[in-house]
Amino acid sequence: MSRLCLSAALLLLLGALVASTPGDEESSLVRAGPPGFCREPPYTGPCSAHFVRYFYNATTGLCQSFVYGGCRGKQNNFMDEKECLHTCDTCAKAQGKRGNCASEMLKSTRPQGWAVAAFQMG
């Protein structure tokens, strides 16, 4: 029984070490994807003002402008394109640039010393 407990403890410790490997933050960020509200369509709202705002278009992977009525806005509603990209474009956050991931080459997201696990983003 004590060997079983020791084995379980070692497995938990190994899992914790792997999860905290330096450089793994990018892997987690790329896999996590944007927040759920970034997939919502733009919402003008019931008011009749005309403010230019930006929303993240999950289909194209770009931030696009739309007209916001001024009240009851939803979360996919940003003052400028930079804020939109920072919040919703996980590819841009991970790679330090803007644009979508669809045209990116295969990218490895492995902790140092592990076998390559590549996948195509987008």
UniProtKB/Swiss-Prot annotation:
Segments forming domain BPTI/Kunitz inhibitor: 38-88
What species does this protein belong to?
Sus scrofa
Cysteine pairings via disulfide bonds = C38-C88, C47-C71, C63-C84
SUPFAM superfamilies cross-referenced by the UniProt entry? BPTI-like (SSF57362)
**Which keywords appear in this protein's UniProt record, sorted alphabetically?**
Disulfide bond, Protease inhibitor, Serine protease inhibitor, Signal
> Among its keywords, does the record have Signal?
yes
CDD domains, per database record: Kunitz_BPTI
Protein name stated in the entry: Uterine plasmin/trypsin inhibitor
Propeptide stretch(es), residue numbers: 21-29
Site positions for Reactive bond, renumbered to this chain? S48, A49
